[in-house]
Amino acid sequence: PGKEDSSYIRYKKQMTFEEKEQFETESKARNEAFTKNSEQKKILGVWFEDEYRRVYPNGSTACNVIGFAQKDGSAGSGGIEQYYNSSLVGNNGREYGYLTSDSNLERVIKPAQNGNTVVSTIDLNIQKICEKYIDEWQAGIGSNVAAAIVMDPKTGEILAMDTSTRYDLNNPYDLSGYYSQEEINAMDDKAKSEAWYKMWRNFCVNDTYEPGSPQKAFTVAGAMEENIINGSETFQCNGFLSIGGHDIHCVSRIVGHGPTTVMQGLMKSCNVVMMNISRMEGVDIFAKYQSIFGFGQKTGIDLPGEADAASLIYTAENMKSADLATNSFGQNYNCTMIQMA
């Protein structure tokens, strides 16, 4: 139905090509019959407008990075589609028509303007490999969420980024991969919205976590940069270290690693080595390098919703000895995966 003051009525949206052909064939036959009987043509002023839809040929691949466009193409949701929406959408064309006094159809066409093309750094082959192994992990040991980033260390380009909660970009509101039909039917609008946003989230950018052992490389790097260690030092690991009234354990908590060099500490993921190094650094230098390495700061990646972890990082002013110790091996503070990468 059209508006009362409208000069035309939009009769139907999203007609199939078969429906269009059927109408054209039938209207042509009827108009020919009217002409044959010397009657004025009765079916006039009807035309069809092409509608373009964004199609994602790779389905769920890199879905949390790409995001999706709404059906009418007016807005992007999540990922690149949302971040670059204003560059991607372009302007829709329009075709207007009116009947002249002698019942001839006149048309006015306003051409469409294409949006810009965005090329990502995602390597499809690497992306599929990431997704394959995340799927295997989830099918085996499993976790609430699993994620991975593959970055070119020379340029910072993201070659792959995956979160285990994937969805089909061509059908982004389909929850059947995570909920039964009975569960979906029982959801109200709020519950459905929460389920959708949970499925669409990009853990690598939108969420924070305790990074754990990858932090150890940064602890060593800061100490070496300040000439506090040179890498030849050896530390004794007995499975724990008493700091600030706490026995803080190593991964080898029963017997420890024994005498362990800095390099061995990285190879064996020794917490005691890291705690000793951070104690040599002190809170001022350790906090300084946390900032230099970008922890607690947004990276500015061109994806929406990057989490702010500024309040989840210790400063030199509020860092106690036990905080320093646990931070040295990536616990007791949060960052995003993209910050860690």
Annotate each predicted stretch with a short phrase.
Residues 43-47, 139-153:
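Short N-terminal helix-loop-first-beta-strand/juxtamembrane motif that initiates sensory/input modules
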